[in-house]
A protein has these predicted regions:
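ASCE RecA-like P-loop NTPase motor cores
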Residues: 1-184
Length: 184
């Protein structure tokens, strides 16, 4: 059962959002060096490039992502290089899990970036006090994912005090993927 179903799509969208910034990439780089002693110079360079690029954007919706393509391509190359370095190492199981989590963080950003631009919303956020910019990417529609992963295997009950008996549930069904789910 899901309570407050009218908020479900927005909550899922928030969870499916990814953010990348100089700060997040520097944290990943530092942790990878500490845990696996890998060369993260390429990642550090990309982090600086991304920060410079983001500073040139206005805060808010990014309607043209073209100028970020070279930076994101360099991020993909740096991530692949780290994958290669890490796969050649003999790491303890616990360390390997931690290292993989940091690489997965980069993967999530790259996967979100790789989605069709018409299926995502991309924007820039900036903390003016610290001068930190972040690239944010979120899916526009979460209904297909909810239909497949949350409602595709078994029946579900969704409740919301904002819905009225006898009213239309169409918008809720559309936003949550209930109209796409194989089970009622």
């Amino acid at each position: 059962a899901v309570d407050e179903a009218h908020e479900l799509a927005e909550r899922v969208r928030e969870q499916a959002s990814v953010a990348v910034s100089l700060k997040s990439m520097t944290r990943i780089s530092r942790r990878l060096r500490a845990l696996a002693s890998v060369d993260t110079d390429a990642l550090d360079h990309v982090a600086a490039q991304l920060d410079t690029a983001l500073q040139s954007f206005q805060v808010g919706l990014m309607t043209d992502r073209t100028s970020l393509k070279p930076v994101m391509s360099a991020l993909d190359t740096a991530k692949r290089d780290l994958d290669t370095q890490i796969s050649a190492l003999q790491l303890e199981a616990a360390t390997k899990v931690l290292v993989r989590a940091f690489i997965d963080e980069l993967d999530q950003v790259l996967q979100a970036w790789g989605r069709d631009a018409e299926k995502s919303v991309t924007w820039v956020e900036r903390d003016e006090d610290r001068g930190l910019s972040s690239l944010m990417i979120a899916p526009l529609h979460v209904a297909p994912s909810l239909a497949d992963n949350a409602f595709g295997q078994r029946p579900a009950i969704l409740t919301s005090a904002t819905l009225s008996l006898g009213g239309s549930f169409d918008s809720l069904a559309y936003s949550t993927g209930l109209n796409m789910a194989p089970l009622p």
